Amino acid sequence: MKKLMKTVLLTTTAFAMTGMVSCPKARADSGKTLNWSVQSDLETLDPQQCVDSTSGQMLNNTCEGLYRHGTNKLEKALAKSCKVSKDGLTWTFKLREDGRWSNGDKVTAGDFVYAFRRAVDPKTNDSNANLFGSIKNAGDIQKGKKKPNELGVSAPDNYTFVVHLSAKVPYFKSLLAGYPFAPVNRKAVEKYGKKYGTAAKYTVSNGPFVMKTWTGSQQRWNLEKNSHYWDRKHVRLDKVHVMVVKEASTGYNLYQTNKLDMVTLSNQQARNLKNNPEFVTREQGRMDYLSLNMNNEYLKNRNVRLALGYALNRKDMVNKVLGNGSETPLSGVPRDFMTYKGKDFANASHTKNATTYDRKKAQNLWNKGLKELGKSGQDVTLTLLGDDDDTTKALNEYIQSAWQTTLKNLTVNVQCMPKTQRIARMMKHDFDVVYTSWGADYNDASTYLNLQAKDSNYNFGQWDNDEYNKLFAASATTDAGNNQKRWNDMVKAEKMLLNDGGILPTLQPSNATMLKKRVRGLVYNPVGGYNWKGVYLK
């Protein structure tokens, strides 16, 4: 499940910012209504079109696939049972027969077949299509060499779903818990066409909740209990009222007046409230990093890229700028995310070029890089673009100061923009540098390494390295069944990426929040996010 979190863009061309959106009027409800806040707009309810964290959060609670993310574990959802062949290539799922769509239709194996084929169909333009790459023929379908109906999935009967893999995938079951692998209602998709998922009335769901009141543009909406959901007796909320709150001061005021049950805190608020009994900080299973556009006249130079990294004091970023429990990074993969034989992947793939702060080295590399480009002594101007929430603004200001005070002749201009505009520019590679945060789709380091693969839709900077691509491909194919070789492939590839300055890891974020004591049964998984299914209010 691709989760693009708070993101900052750097571009050499500034453009005007318009349409700053004000916070909607809040309304507090009691009883069985949970009042929740998010920091960015909802963009889609189509699991094959989602690229942002807010949409992902809503999809995690309105659609349901074979498995769900529980508290640090997977739970069966529509999968009643699973049988895997001895070679690990054929997965046969028996489905629950009481699964229902919000329109009353039965959820069948055919819905999964349709959804998987739709995801890999080039016409869908699904940014998450690469996640299906291990399924037989998926790659050829995405390249237009084969048809979607040749994908290695089938439905022998209404409640049997079979998946054929081209290579063993150690994390396949975890992958299936993500919303990209949820079924979709073919009748609804064909009825609404391109409108599907763009508003509540153009959406059909099969999860614990259904979306209500969202028209596709406003900054508050309701999720209501799905009366057709197979496990509705364990859904204790009647409604989740969600509002977009970008300013931390506004959010905390709403929280104090009981109009919100959960709010994300700014860095200063986190410091002031860390001893409050309602203060909660959570590791988010994601990594902040700078993606650099290799087509930029300056950033195509390795020494220039590394200079930008060495100029960042990551300890200051987590302690002085944020102060919310975030950690400095070791590599482009979070600490304690993946281990093998007692070794942590982040430690194993750590390189000095990735995370070290050294002003003198940054200056030397900067001067060397500009000389190699024939631009010594020339002024360099970059415009720093970022989301319009308080946390991103604070990070923008730090980066502006760090780069301007360390690197000679560099000017950094700062602008803020709504997340929807930023994502649109990022997906078109219309930037110089993107400060982005990637949330894990599944419990394996490949969810991060895949981002920089040549054919990945999320290789925003278009970094390309033949050896990296070969190593990553081997880890997913020829070496997939050999844990040691697979580990070595990925560690070597990650080091190669970092030593080349392909990305610049900035920090491993945590989320500092206030959560009302009346909220019980809330499940949080660093991979799957918040699960409201079992929440109740006391």
Language model features with spans:
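Aromatic- and charge-enriched surface segment that lines or borders ligand/interaction sites
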Residues: 80-131, 162, 298-300
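Gly/Pro-rich hinge or "lid" segments in bacterial periplasmic/extracellular proteins
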Residues: 165-239, 249
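Ligand-site clamp/hinge motif
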Residues: 226-271
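Structural transition elements
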Residues: 328-369, 391-393
